[in-house]
Amino acid sequence: GGDIDDLKEVSIPEDLFESSSGFNENGTAQFIAQVWDRAGNSIVGSVSDSILNIDQTLPIGISLELTSSNSINPDMVIPGDSITFQLNTSENIEAPFFVINGDDYENAIGLGKSWMLVYYAEEADDGVIEFRVNFNDIAGNPGKPISEALDSKTLIMDGTPPELSDITLFTSNKY
């Protein structure tokens, strides 16, 4: 208990809120409270300054493109190369979160529906570059994580220098 001026947290069940008159996608909601005490006295508060924007639509990853800076083979990455991840979504999102070969990257740049991250492959282990992109729309609705490029392109890290073995020299010179 406490005075009428005390702040109280009230929860409205999801199904009750969604079935209320005027609830619709892209709509807004404001709240007003009516409170009764044990003696039956009541008071109606003023309309809340807070406006709730209703957004239940999940964002969709429209495309994710991978581009290697390797000029000899665009499907390979070697030390010194970079990989550009270009993400496009169905609606404006917060900055996406990348996990590349088990490491977290939160430094994507972009705005709205288009985001890019440049990954420098210096420390990557040899093999396929594995990744997952997590993203939420502005309302916080999560998109389905993306773990492959739209065209299913994969990039392979090869940081092992070539070796020569069993070299035999011969000459046709008589001398």
Question: Which residues does each PLM region occupy?
Answer:
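Short, solvent-exposed loop/linker segments at the N-terminal edge
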Residues: 71-81, 171-175
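Short, solvent-exposed loop/turn segments at the edges of extracellular beta-sandwich modules
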Residues: 36-42, 136-145
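Surface-exposed, short loops/turns at beta-strand junctions within beta-sandwich domains
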Residues: 16-28, 120-128
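Flexible, low-complexity linkers/stalks enriched in Thr/Pro that connect modular domains
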Residues: 37, 48-67, 148-172
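Aromatic sugar-binding surface patches on proteins
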Residues: 2-18, 111-118
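Extracellular recognition modules
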Residues: 30-36, 130-136
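Short proline/glycine-enriched turn/loop motifs at strand-loop junctions of beta-rich domains
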Residues: 80, 89-95
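Extracellular fibronectin type III
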Residues: 42-48
